[in-house]
A protein has these predicted regions:
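Conserved beta-strand hairpin/beta-sheet module of binuclear metal-dependent hydrolase folds
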Residues: 3-58, 148-159
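Short, glycine/acidic-enriched loop or turn micro-motifs at the edges of active sites
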Residues: 47-48, 77, 164, 222
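Active-site metal-binding motif and surrounding structural segment of the metallo-beta-lactamase
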Residues: 50-95
């Protein structure tokens, strides 16, 4: 399934993959594409097995030569296992936390020269003219070097594994419709994969100042409206990781 989440003037934010690959049994994932004028940004393209279906979707909206940037939230294979083929097929530069630069060669990536490290404090990534993406640190929230992506035009925050849910679960469609019912789908994951409540609170305080219309995680349903507020409140109070030892 692909769905345009935002479309205004020369700017789009598109969900191009939603938890449907048969190769991803147990860990279904979401992939996103941002288009700004003639520049396209691919977020967390996933493993090699996803390439054919993502390519067919992507070509509905853009051209391979227009993929300007790839942003990787962290080092896991469901995020960047297929990175080599995207670097071979495009001229894009890929961005990932500095922490993971020395590990990526283990994915047999040939074009390491086109991978750029993101500093621990995050950065504003200029795409064209005045348009930029905010790359926001989310360290120790699953990965010790995780990065979120905020698009100030669409007001969509890509949160990587934060807010992730295991599917199929609950009676939702694309967006979380009943957060209280959906909590059982995210509770176990967050208690095990997030390092601590201290890390969660630091992240919540960092992002709650943003104007957010949609939270788009790497796995599971998306959040909008009241569910954005409820997710942040839930995470702020959650005991997880080392809190449970």
């Amino acid at each position: 399934m692909d769905k345009i989440l935002f479309d205004e003037k020369n700017h789009k934010f598109i969900l191009i993959g939603f938890a449907e690959s048969k190769d991803e049994q147990g860990i279904p994932s979401n992939q996103y594409l941002i288009q700004h004028k003639n520049k396209s940004i691919l977020i967390d393209p996933g493993g090699f097995g996803l390439f054919p279906i993502l390519l067919s979707r992507l070509l509905k909206y853009t051209k391979l030569q227009d993929i300007h940037t790839i942003v990787l939230s962290h080092q896991d294979p469901d995020v960047c296992g297929g990175l080599n083929i995207w670097l071979e097929m495009t001229e894009a530069e890929a961005y990932i936390s500095n922490l993971w630069l020395r590990f990526l060669p283990h994915y047999d990536i040939k074009r390491i020269d086109r991978i750029i490290g993101i500093p621990d404090e995050g950065m504003d990534l200029t795409i064209e003219g005045k348009f930029y993406l905010k790359l926001i640190p989310a360290h120790f929230l699953h990965s010790p070097g995780q990065v979120n992506v905020y698009d100030p035009v669409s007001k969509i925050l890509f949160t990587g594994d934060i807010g992730a849910g295991m599917l199929p679960c609950s009676e939702n469609n694309l967006f979380v419709e009943d957060f209280e019912n959906y909590k059982k789908c995210i509770d176990g994951f967050h208690k095990r994969y997030m390092a601590s409540n201290q890390a969660l609170r630091k992240w919540v305080k960092n992002v709650e100042s943003l104007d957010i219309n949609i939270i788009a995680p790497k796995h599971g349903y998306l959040y909008k409206g009241e569910s954005v507020k409820k997710l942040l409140e839930y995470l702020y109070d959650l005991k997880c990781g080392i809190d449970l030892l």
